[in-house]
């Protein structure tokens, strides 16, 4: 068998744009013949997938699945809403979800490695970059989920709650975007950052520092309530807080996860003229 040198792998990477491991694998299969490796990569769609890999995948789906006291939430991205609704893309995402819950896989890199060949083939077929972005799990006595279309997904774990209550809590979390369960759960880092912001605002009003600090204390209590689930007004009955709702049912929320498609991903905005110009350069 021919020796697969680093320089050979480097050359194939430069010519195809594919990843190092993909290039090495292709060269091994082609017994060191770089032209055959390129031909095989073209047939498999690896080159097309590599070219699409640089495209921003900020659309896609959020999926959830519960098995008893264990739940999984997954985000799989594509580039457009059109592909997010494609049957092939959705089937791929659901297959990844099934594998994640069956194997209790919460390491996204493990899922990526497991489904890389299928992902590459789908990219070649659909013509958009596809990315298994993130996965997380939750466990608890009672689990509930809610999906707002395929763009927002929530998992909730609770004690002493029935299925209807956890469903309502999941819907609340989807709408109100809490970051923590209780006000006391808000991290010291988040509290300190907000405290400094509020103190600067109060000081700019010309108040003495002692008065400004007292003003900020009140604002901070309001802030920790706003960013925590139990401190928020319940969306289905704003006359009571989520904490009051839980007390009425003698229930407690032990955790939740909320995913929204593309959050934290910077989309590339391209105007029509620029898009036409870009296409003309490719032709």
UniProtKB/Swiss-Prot annotation:
InterPro entries: EF-Ts_dimer_sf (IPR036402), Transl_elong_EFTs/EF1B (IPR001816), Transl_elong_EFTs/EF1B_dimer (IPR014039), Transl_elong_Ts_CS (IPR018101), UBA-like_sf (IPR009060). Pfam families: EF_TS (PF00889). Disulfide bonds: none annotated. Residues 80-83 are annotated as: Involved in Mg(2+) ion dislocation from EF-Tu. It is found in: Cytoplasm. Keywords: Cytoplasm, Elongation factor, Protein biosynthesis. It comes from the Bacteria. GO terms for cellular component: cytoplasm. Associates with the EF-Tu.GDP complex and induces the exchange of GDP to GTP. It remains bound to the aminoacyl-tRNA.EF-Tu.GTP complex up to the GTP hydrolysis stage on the ribosome. Belongs to the EF-Ts family. This is Elongation factor Ts. The lineage of its organism: Bacteria, Pseudomonadati, Pseudomonadota, Gammaproteobacteria, Enterobacterales.
């Amino acid at each position: 068998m021919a020796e697969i040198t680093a320089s050979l792998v480097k050359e194939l990477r430069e010519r195809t744009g594919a990843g190092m491991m993909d290039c090495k694998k292709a060269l091994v299969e082609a017994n060191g013949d770089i032209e055959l490796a390129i031909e095989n990569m073209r047939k498999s769609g690896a080159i097309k997938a590599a070219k699409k890999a640089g495209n921003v995948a900020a659309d896609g789906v959020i999926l959830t699945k519960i098995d008893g006291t264990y739940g999984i939430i997954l985000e799989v991205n594509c580039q457009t809403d059109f592909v997010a609704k494609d049957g092939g893309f959705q089937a791929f995402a659901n297959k990844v979800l099934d594998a994640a819950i069956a194997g209790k896989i919460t390491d996204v890199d493990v899922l990526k490695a497991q489904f890389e060949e299928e992902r590459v083939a789908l990219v070649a077929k659909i013509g958009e970059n596809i990315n298994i972005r993130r996965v997380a799990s939750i466990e608890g006595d009672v689990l509930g989920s809610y999906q707002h279309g395929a763009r927002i997904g929530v998992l909730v774990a609770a004690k002493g709650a029935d299925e209807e209550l956890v469903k309502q809590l999941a819907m609340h979390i989807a709408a109100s975007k809490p970051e923590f369960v209780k006000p006391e759960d808000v991290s010291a880092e988040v509290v300190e950052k907000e405290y400094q912001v509020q103190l600067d605002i109060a000081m700019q009003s010309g108040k003495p520092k002692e008065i400004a600090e007292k003003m900020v204390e009140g604002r901070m209590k309001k802030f920790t309530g706003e960013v925590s689930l139990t401190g928020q007004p319940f969306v289905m009955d704003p006359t009571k807080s989520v904490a009051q709702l839980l007390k009425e049912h003698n229930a407690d929320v032990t955790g939740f996860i909320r995913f929204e498609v593309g959050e934290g991903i910077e989309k590339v905005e391209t105007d029509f003229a620029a898009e036409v110009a870009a296409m003309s350069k490719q032709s």
